[in-house]
UniProtKB/Swiss-Prot annotation:
Naturally occurring in which organism (per UniProt): Shigella flexneri
EC number: 2.7.7.60
Nucleotidyltransferase as UniProt keyword: yes
HAMAP family in UniProt: IspD
InterPro entries according to UniProt: IspD, IspD/TarI, IspD/TarI_cytidylyltransf_bact, ISPD_synthase_CS, Nucleotide-diphossugar_trans
Source superkingdom: Bacteria
CDD domains: CDP-ME_synthetase
GO biological process, one term: isopentenyl diphosphate biosynthetic process, methylerythritol 4-phosphate pathway
Subunit structure: Homodimer.
Keyword field: Isoprene biosynthesis, Nucleotidyltransferase, Transferase
Biochemical pathway: Isoprenoid biosynthesis; isopentenyl diphosphate biosynthesis via DXP pathway; isopentenyl diphosphate from 1-deoxy-D-xylulose 5-phosphate: step 2/6
Full protein name: 2-C-methyl-D-erythritol 4-phosphate cytidylyltransferase
Molecular function terms, GO-annotated: 2-C-methyl-D-erythritol 4-phosphate cytidylyltransferase activity
Family: Belongs to the IspD/TarI cytidylyltransferase family. IspD subfamily.
């Protein structure tokens, strides 16, 4: 079926292991309820009608994905990821087809809310460079002394935001910025940082702070609580 200007492809880099989870199983394959974290993350994307396809970049040696129902989903494409996140995203972009806009979403961020996703997708009507979901920093921030666990000073949190995902950009722009940044040896921690490196200024779309990334063991219980609460609210 031909794509339209409204169609969006989502890219989910899922080739990482996540050693901070202190488990032999990659964190995206840990279960919350009757689904893996990866399944929760992908289904949240597919719940929006504009997201017509999801490309998942997995490790070439991954044997777990084929055991999931996602492996046979008609809207899912699987590609081999790379050593770094940016390599996996580029592999996903190459498989995204001719869509104008792409989302990039963390495999281990299962608590995405549909209202946040809808507001982010609306950027395609008002922005040429896209933007990201983000949450204003509310905690007091400290900078440490170099090489020490000692406070150097308090950082002014005004204007500081936590970068979340999804992140949403024109496909060709993101591809070109990632390629240039990697070729020039830039440090790329998320997709927005590639655009920043190339002189662009993506928009900040305020999202819910409970859109957490499961990184440490204690995050798993918190994500389960948030997902259970959301399901309960939807059913009442």
């Amino acid at each position: 079926m031909a794509t339209t200007h409204l169609d969006v492809c989502a890219v989910v880099p899922a080739a990482g292991f996540g050693r901070r989870m202190q488990t032999e199983c990659p964190k995206q394959y840990l279960s919350i309820g009757n689904q893996t974290i990866l399944e929760h993350s992908v289904h949240a994307l597919l719940a929006h009608p504009r997201v017509t396809r999801v490309v998942i970049a997995i490790s070439p040696g991954d044997s777990r994905f084929a055991q999931l129902p996602l492996a046979n989903h008609p809207q899912i494409t699987v590609v081999d990821g790379g050593d770094e996140r940016a390599d996996s995203v580029l592999a996903g972009l190459k498989a995204a087809g001719d869509v104008q806009w792409v989302l990039v979403h963390d495999a281990a961020r299962p608590c995405l809310h549909q209202d946040d996703l809808a507001r982010l997708l609306a950027l395609s009507e008002t922005s040429r460079t896209g933007g990201i979901l983000a949450a204003p920093v509310r905690d007091t921030m400290k900078r440490a002394e170099p090489g020490k666990n000692a406070i150097a000073h308090t950082v002014d949190r005004n204007g500081l935001w936590h970068a979340l995902t999804p992140q949403f950009f024109p496909r060709e722009l993101l591809h070109d910025c990632l390629t240039r940044a990697l070729n020039e040896g830039a440090t790329i921690t998320d997709e927005a940082s590639a655009l920043e490196y190339c002189g662009f200024h993506p928009q900040l779309v305020e999202g819910r702070a409970d859109n957490i990334k499961v990184t440490r063991p204690e995050d798993l219980a918190l994500a389960e609580f948030y997902l259970t609460r959301t399901i309960h609210q939807e059913n009442t």
